[in-house]
Design a protein with these regions (language model features):
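Metal-cofactor-binding active-site regions of metalloenzymes
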Residues: 1, 5-192
Length: 192
């Protein structure tokens, strides 16, 4: 049982290999990039997009910045989890730091390129019974529909995350309400 995670349903819908270590381990984890941002690192340099758009950062350079600052996570749940993943999943036994960044990036990248490290294979390898992802009320759930229609037996479900439509101070509140109205008009409830 894992009480929390950062997974994108698109990973399981496409079941494509991850391109590099930054894609599954750094970019989707807001706990990691928040810590790094708090220490003055630019999110775009970490491979994390912003309101201005997606990042064009070089994934290896982003990983190097992460590795050079990994010490900031000492004693945190993120540090414990990542060290477990590095050791048990990727068979890495040296400490992640600036001098080992490229070694980590290369070893992880080589493994991620294999069929055993594709999203659905990892789901099955870890004996996951159900995985819940969080989506906004204005998400069309296309990736979830694709998973359900794929014939794959893995259970990836959506969990409602209403922040954008119930918090008037949320940065996307107005746009989210407009989009929600459009979706309601397009997909009216039947029999209600």
């Amino acid at each position: 049982l894992s009480p929390h995670g950062h997974t994108d349903p698109q990973w399981f819908a496409a079941d494509a290999a991850f391109g590099n270590a930054t894609e599954p381990l750094l970019a989707p984890d807001h706990y990691l990039f928040r810590m790094l941002y708090s220490q003055g690192l630019d999110l775009n340099e970490l491979g994390v997009g912003s309101r201005r758009g997606p990042s064009n950062a070089n994934p290896r350079e982003a990983w190097r910045k992460f590795a050079a600052n990994f010490y900031l996570f000492n004693g945190t749940p993120s540090w414990l989890w990542l060290n477990y993943v590095f050791a048990k999943v990727f068979d890495l036994s040296v400490r992640l730091e600036a001098s080992t960044a490229d070694h980590y990036f290369d070893v992880i990248g080589e493994k991620l390129a294999t069929p055993a490290f594709r999203p659905r294979a990892l789901f099955e390898r870890f004996n996951i019974e159900v995985l819940a992802t969080t989506e906004s009320p204005v998400d069309t759930l296309d990736h979830h529909h694709k998973i359900q229609n794929s014939g794959w037996k893995g259970r990836v479900v959506t969990a409602y995350r209403p922040d954008a439509v119930i918090d008037p101070e949320h940065e996307q509140f107005k746009d989210a309400l407009t989009r929600l109205r459009e979706l309601i008009d397009r997909y009216p409830l039947r029999g209600v």
